[in-house]
Amino acid sequence: MDYKNSGVDIEAGYKSVELMKKHVKETMRPEVLGGLGGFSGAFSLASIKDMEDPVLLSGTDGCGTKVKLAFIMDKHDTIGIDAVAMCVNDVACAGGEPLFFLDYIACGKNYPEKIATIVSGVAEGCKQSGCALVGGETAEHPGLMPEDEYDLAGFAVGVVDRKDIITGEGLKDGDVLIGMASTGVHSNGFSLVRKIFKMDKETLNTYHEELGTTLGEALLAPTRIYVKALKAVKDAGVTVKACSHITGGGFYENIPRMLIDGKRAVVEKNSYPVPPIFKMMAREGNVEEQMMYNTYNMGLGMIVAVDPADVDKTMEAMKSAGDTPYVVGKIIDGEKGVDLV
């Protein structure tokens, strides 16, 4: 008996690495030391010497049960973008620049072409956020996971000068909330999605006029990465006072996390367009509006608070980075929390 008889194919692992190398190479930054295959990824910090007090930021996340849709649709080239987005958006939300990323794939069976396709999405997410893919792990788990399934997670490290960390300090009554459009559901709440819709190829491949695409394509749309937009705002000389990445828990959980005691956020629901996919989900699943806003981003993936005098500069900077911003509310004095009006 050998290792392959037990369900672990070492040769498939080697082939996966060879196939993914070209994708990884496309993400390299000058600070990366060495190549793929070492025991650890090395990244020089010499480029941050101009910072007064550099602080490293880290984030880890996955794609949740969104991967189930990738299995059903046999589409694996974008789920890696989601893994990167969930991590680097958190780093950027604190004011940081993502530096490097590592991925972790657990699978029932290592199909090299599929693994390389997944990593191509990870690499694309890294390119969109300007960080290097310095390493990763593909773990074959025979007997623990079905052969055609996998889970994907990632880890991002970034840097920010301590004085530039976004903490919510300095928020005042009248500060303006600006939200950036999402691509759709992003990467959370898919356990509910899978209860609302029948999860089979026929259902997911059905075209819907109101969506302008198939249900599966709308649901699998990769999470938007806001790193470049937030950097553009910073480069425009705007101080972002507070920032919230709208993920699991929706508006009600994530917006209060950007606030300080004594400040409350007011969001106007009609100030921006809610994507059709959320309207369809609410209708087909008979999901109450409050539950939708307590679970999903409802069309806004990132919300920042800025001084009223900086609104125009902020909007222009976000647009220049390719994002779609909306003025969606304001900060008021009051108990820490959020009101949707």
Swiss-Prot record:
Keywords: ATP-binding, Cytoplasm, Ligase, Nucleotide-binding, Purine biosynthesis. Gene3D superfamilies: PurM-like C-terminal domain, PurM-like, N-terminal domain. GO terms for biological process: 'de novo' IMP biosynthetic process; adenine biosynthetic process. One of its GO terms (cellular component) is cytosol. It is found in: Cytoplasm. Transmembrane segments: none annotated. InterPro entries: PurM-like_C_dom, PurM-like_C_sf, PurM-like_N, PurM-like_N_sf, PurM_cligase. Its main location: cytoplasm. Its EC number is 6.3.3.1. GO terms for molecular function: ATP binding; phosphoribosylamine-glycine ligase activity; phosphoribosylformylglycinamidine cyclo-ligase activity. Belongs to the AIR synthase family. This is Phosphoribosylformylglycinamidine cyclo-ligase. It comes from Agathobacter rectalis (strain ATCC 33656 / DSM 3377 / JCM 17463 / KCTC 5835 / VPI 0990) (Eubacterium rectale).
